[in-house]
Amino acid sequence: MPTKAELENQVESNSQEIRRLQRALKQAHIDLPEIQRKELDNPVPHWIPAVETALNRAEAEWNRVVIEPDARIDDYIRTRDGLGWSWAEQYKKNGQFAWCGAFAAYAWSSVRLDIRQKIFPSCYRFYSRWGKTQRCIEPSLMLPGDIVIISTVNGASWGDHITVATSAPSSDGTFETIEGNARGILGNGSTGEGVIKLTRPMERVMYVYRVLEEDLA
């Protein structure tokens, strides 16, 4: 018979898998009406000053202690500072919208609104629009501010969760993030779901995308 600790571990594992599936389903729903559009040009990636602004905005949101289903999440999704999806239903319930990309869009509010609206909502959109451009860089070249797409077990080939890197890869094969719509360390130091910080393994990285100066408003 399993011990209590073993059962608790299994429950936690199952909860994480359910969350992954729900997130993937919500992102798939976002992309259902998407039609193929002309891909952006291929520029040369490089460091830009706007990175510091993006990281500061992400850090400020983490310090706000945004916990599911905080009304602040609706700002990430529907206002012009985030995705700008003003037509989306008001966010009131945990799991209602896969908002990891919306949080990245809010951090990167300096990016043109049309790009945030069209590309930031899902992993698939990043992959289909930026995957074959020079914005897509080798994971080993990751820098703070890069948009990092990760995959959990049995995830989609284009990834299933959007994060913002706050570090380069470390020697132990991990990197640091601030991200939304995930479970990790909240701004008050507790563990919960919302805007969180996390140490993630590089082996889960699917793609790394870097915003360029020409993407800025």
PLM feature spans:
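N-terminal capping segments
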Residues: 34-111
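Active-site signature of cysteine proteases
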Residues: 169-217
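Heptad-repeat coiled-coil/leucine-zipper oligomerization helices
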Residues: 3, 10, 17-20, 24, ...
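Short intrinsically disordered terminal tails
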Residues: 1-2, 142, 215-217
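...with weaker cross-activation on analogous glycine-rich loops/strands in unrelated enzymes
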Residues: 114-187
